[in-house]
């Protein structure tokens, strides 16, 4: 990898239940680029992980839940200065276990948010594009967003 052009692989998942998405309000870390934003759960790949491995680990770490039914919905390429991030975007509607609301306490606060209210929250502008695609139930999509 060219050190002048670093790449990052991440996952993000929106758990769905009763017309709501499980959202993480990122309020804990002060120097967090997502500070005060509402996002799904997920994170960075660890060494040797596949997108699915990362998804399952991150959801379990941040929620206490083990996913049983999930779907890769798209790949979002973020251009952030010299960094390129490839985010594998998932939704899930099946899991086992009980939600541990403070599992993500190092990241923020977990809340179930009605899908109709998500775009009124402080979210990234680009996220509004993929929220629309998720609501339209597009089978798969790819986006490129520059910040």
Explain the meaning of each model-derived region:
Residues 1, 73-79:
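Short, solvent-exposed loop/turn elements at beta->coil junctions and helix N-caps
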Residues 1-23, 44:
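Conserved N-terminal beta-strand and adjoining loop/helix that marks the start
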Residues 21-57, 61:
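Conserved Nudix-box catalytic region and its N-terminal flanking loop in Nudix hydrolases
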